[in-house]
Amino acid sequence: MPRNYTTQEKIDQEFGFLVKDKDNHEHYGKILQQDRENIHTQVGVVLPGSYELSRIELVEGNFAIVLLDHSSERIAYYVKASVWKDVVLNASPVTQVLLWRTNDVRHEMVTTGLARSIFFKYLLESYNVVASDSHQTAEGREFWTRQTGFALATDLYVYRYHRIDCTLIKITDHAIIRDNSCDLWGDNEDYCNVLAIISKEAITI
């Protein structure tokens, strides 16, 4: 899977507008001015009355899934996703390029389990193939380790895909993902080209 993303300054830049309370509140206000598609039914979650789970379209074909709390006027959960065409896979995978959840315990009951529901019930159902990002934090790596395990347990397809070599290796044993003996993660630049793939259907190249 991707190159390990360990530079704290870069991580702070990615998540800064969500982590800082003032910036979070300001971004919440900006989202209210945008067109939003409520997706809580597709995701299969029941939300308390003050919460809204919506999709908003971004530039260059990207989109975001946001959990808004209208009581506190804050963003409680944010996923930025990108859809890209891959001619080798003959598919258009969706990739979560940013995933953030508030650590404010007031939202914990609502956000717990939301990541998996969005991943499998919305992203995978909508696009059939979900691919990892090219860089990941330690938390992102842990997230993908869990999701691949869930995918294998529910008879979905998991692969290691190298975008330059055009190699696709099917993975059936979650243990080799947990200990990384399948070589999904690493520190050198080439790991930017290594992706984990979860698919609803078998992929052949």
How would you name each of these model-derived features?
Residues 1-110, 121-205:
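Non-catalytic substrate-recognition and accessory regions of acyl/acetyltransferase enzymes
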Residues 115-116:
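Contiguous hydrophobic, core-forming segments of folded domains
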